[in-house]
Swiss-Prot record:
Glycans are attached at residues 62, 131, 338. Keywords: Glycoprotein, Hydrogen peroxide, Oxidoreductase, Peroxidase, Secreted, Signal. It comes from Dictyostelium discoideum. The lineage of its organism: Eukaryota, Amoebozoa, Evosea, Eumycetozoa, Dictyostelia. Its main location: secreted. It is found in: Secreted. This is Peroxinectin A.
């Protein structure tokens, strides 16, 4: 009996020692890879899967296709609702946006490259003036060693790559910020909790927190009315903000739990443990629910590999993972507890609108998990294509044009060239891309040949792979990225070390997160990404 007690106290002492000395992630991503501490951290270059197109002597890509807005008008114009073939919900595209806001951000530089508007454009040049443009500022880039290969090369032989302003790991920086200073500003600094505002409709993120920079691209409301969260784009739409809210509530629930179970822990220890559990929750939802819904399946974890670079690829963030923009429907839907559809909010009025949460997150969450999203294809709703962040002529933009312009700015090669470099067979005819005659006709009207197609357009136009909601090209890019994201993360939740650290986390499905962080939510299907 005495031996058993001694053994117990030895094991307990070891566990306490491990717990107290535990290394947690940095906020910047730095130090994750011990061999290359900067790898995957903030303000480091994207990597490439394919060689970019050539740039001219002025530093601009050699483009012979029509301007981006002209392509947008031919290809992306959506007139009718086209429901998801896979019966996916609006929550699916919201999680995708939340996820990419954790992994990548291309910040602009002062160098402008305006998007030419076709004369007599219905929205942006109705008076047929013929000299209208839309603002586009080129992505910030940095000089890199030419021996890394697959980089943009200028006329002087110097090599450049666009900068990822976020850490590339799935590390919760979307909630906690990508610096210790921002995170401290968002913390209550008491009991390991995050700052929240108590309201009649539940706890919501705080507003106007000093030292926490937030975007306000629409300028519909003063910036001091916007919510403060860890990623500056958090107010882009209320669906995105609702996911922030749920996970912040869950963080504080965990903090209260750990403070109760471990009275010897200080605020910092409780906070870091709660943060680690929320990161695990985000990773688990992404790999157990989101990726199988996107790709049909995803292989099991095989362990950490320090030789794998988890940095985001340019093709992933600039091209393939922008498929989500075609999923967005014309309204933010709200539902009551008994399933009654409430007054919806048009997307064009949802941008950076803090009042969209005045009824709480519950009506919006119900809408996200009930409503079927738009199909993933070449079509994009008018509120994104003509009214992004404002009215045409009053600051409004075209998201499809911006995506195309960014692909060209980053030197993403044409569709067939990209396919070849990815090891895929190049297409010969329009019907090799899609079996849909209407999409074939739009491609023919926009491009001279299949070799001219912009990769963003070609990838969206493809027939979906069986069991997946995307075509072959985007499938490969997305699969490749998320394989590296997981394999190259020393703090991945499935490593033996992190399983020990997070043994009290009790992570669950996304459906269970919703149930425990909302009030009177009603029925929540097991897979909230599918109807």
């Amino acid at each position: 009996m005495r031996l058993n007690l001694i053994s117990f106290f030895i094991i307990f002492t070891i566990l306490v020692s491990i717990s107290n000395s535990q290394e947690f992630r940095s906020y910047t991503g730095e130090g994750n890879n011990k061999q290359n501490p900067k790898q995957g951290s903030i303000f480091t270059p994207f990597i490439r899967l394919a060689n970019p197109i050539k740039f001219n002597k002025n530093g601009f890509p050699n483009i012979t296709n029509q301007p981006s807005r002209a392509i947008s008008n031919i290809i992306f114009d959506q007139q009718t609702h086209i429901g998801s073939k896979e019966h996916l919900t609006d929550m699916f595209n919201m999680w995708g946006q939340f996820l990419i806001h954790n992994m990548a951000l291309s910040k602009p530089e002062p160098n402008s490259w305006p998007i030419k508007v076709p004369k007599c454009d219905q929205y942006f040049d109705p008076a047929c003036i013929g000299n209208k443009t839309m603002n586009y500022f080129r992505t910030r880039a940095t000089e890199v060693p030419c021996d890394v290969g697959k980089t943009v090369v200028d006329e002087d032989g110097k090599c450049y790559e666009q900068i990822n302003s976020l850490g590339s790991y799935i590390d919760g920086n979307v909630l906690y910020g990508n610096s210790e200073e921002i995170c401290k500003n968002l913390r209550s600094l008491s009991g390991g909790e995050m700052k929240m505002t108590v309201t009649d409709v539940g706890d919501l993120p705080p507003k106007n927190v000093p030292g926490v920079p937030m975007d306000n691209d629409a300028n519909l409301f003063p910036i001091d009315q916007l919510y403060s969260v860890g990623e500056r784009r958090g107010n882009e739409n209320p669906g995105l903000l609702s996911i922030h809210t749920l996970l912040l509530r869950d963080h504080n629930r965990l903090a209260r739990k750990f403070a109760r179970l471990h009275p010897e822990w200080d605020d910092e220890r409780v906070f870091q443990q709660s943060r680690s559990c929320i990161i695990e929750q985000i990773q688990k939802i992404t790999y157990d629910e989101y990726l199988p819904t996107t790709l049909g399946s995803f292989p099991s974890y095989t362990g950490y590999d320090a030789n794998v670079n988890a940095q985001v690829s340019n093709e992933f963030t600039t091209t393939a993972f922008r498929f989500g923009h075609s999923e967005v429907g014309p309204f933010m839907e709200y539902y009551s507890e008994n399933g009654t559809r409430l007054q919806p909010l048009p997307i064009k009025f949802s941008y950076f609108n803090p009042h969209a949460l005045n009824r709480g997150v519950e009506p919006l969450i119900r809408g996200l998990i009930i409503n079927e999203e738009e199909n993933i294809d070449i079509y994009m709703i008018s509120d994104l294509r003509n009214f992004l962040f404002g009215k045409p002529g009053q600051g409004g933009l075209d998201l499809a044009s911006r995506n195309l312009q960014r692909n060209r700015d980053h030197g993403i090669p044409p569709y067939n060239s990209l396919r070849r470099q990815l090891g895929l067979r190049p297409v010969q005819t329009w019907s090799d891309i899609t079996s849909d005659p209407q999409i074939q006709n739009r491609l023919k009207n926009a491009y001279k040949s299949v070799d001219d197609i912009d990769s963003y357009v070609g990838g969206l136009a493809e027939d979906h792979m069986e069991g997946s909601c995307v075509g072959q090209t985007f499938y490969l890019i997305i699969y490749e990225q998320f394989f590296r994201t997981r394999a190259g993360d020393r703090f991945w939740y499935e490593t033996p070390e992190m399983r020990m650290v997070n043994r009290e986390c009790e992570t669950t499905t996304f459906a269970e997160v919703i149930k425990r962080t909302t009030s009177n939510i009603g029925y929540v299907q097991p897979n909230v990404f599918r109807k």
